[in-house]
Amino acid sequence: VLVALVFITVQQTVKLNAWYGEFYDLLQKPEQAGGLEKFWDFMAQFAWIAFPFMLLRSLETYLASHFAFRWRQALTEEYLPRWQGTDAIVEGASQRIQEDCMRFARQTENLGLGLVRAVLTLLSFIPILWALSTGMAIAWLQFEGSLFWVALVTALGGTAISWFVGIRLPGLEYNNQRTEAALRKDLVYAEDDRSRMDLPTVLELFMGVRLNNFRLFNHYAYFHLWSNFYSQVMVIFPYLLMGPSLFTGLITLGVIQQVGNAFGKVNDAFSYLIDRWTDITELRSIYKRLSEFERALA
């Protein structure tokens, strides 16, 4: 059901892309006969496309949330009896069952559904972008499917740079969860009996949390600087490629809007790993903790 909903919403974006082309062609020549009537017709068409899209996306989010919680429930029901029946001492076991299972289920659902959307977007928009690659005024782009290949190369290059810039993030996220768990454990003991709290020890644990968080902030700052730069360049990039064709009369304003939208969709799908790198980093650290928990319960 979720995959079907994603497929339908992707097809709605395909219809919207075609709408962009015709609508902006109309705006390019507003003085044509019957222009105002056509404008209102386009507004009605937009509503016919956009409102079902919004409803379907809302339904998709609702069903995905239920799916993620049922996955969390299955993990919890699997781990609790095994934890109860073992004498193994596992650091932060309660956190791994309560928090890590919740975050693992949410992130897996979030990333998995996003990956399905990216694949379906590629299947839908690659033919459109390929067809729109004709009429290029830039000499080195005058070959079949040029815009598709540009989108692919820029996405692969961006992903490679993102991997290099964010290479230390998974380890730092894992260490962050460990230091937070150690601090939480001492605070829980103190909540039950204040006399059991050793203030210097708790403050030392907090300083460990502080040190790791500051390292994490620094590395995320590098990554976000690169990620934001890449995102902004990709917004303007298709217009840099197609602008000369517009001003030489090879294409219309509607076509350049279609290209900008289709290029963005394809590049975003190819750049899925870049856009979701922080979520993937978090998921990897959670997976590592749950894998350790699995081995301890074996």
Where are the regions that the model predicts?
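Alpha-helical segments in transporter systems
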Residues: 1-19, 38-49, 60-65, 105-125, ...
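Primarily ABC-family ATPase nucleotide-binding module
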Residues: 97-98, 294-298
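Hydrophobic alpha-helical transmembrane segments of ABC transporter permease domains
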Residues: 98-149, 234
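Helix-loop-helix
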Residues: 129-156, 219-287
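Short helix-terminus and kink motifs of transmembrane alpha helices
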Residues: 14-22, 61, 65, 69, ...
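An intracellular "coupling" helix at the cytosolic face of ABC transporter transmembrane type-1 domains
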Residues: 103, 175-185, 189-237, 279-282, ...
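Transmembrane-helix motif of ABC transporter permease domains
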Residues: 1-12, 31-72, 141-164, 251-267
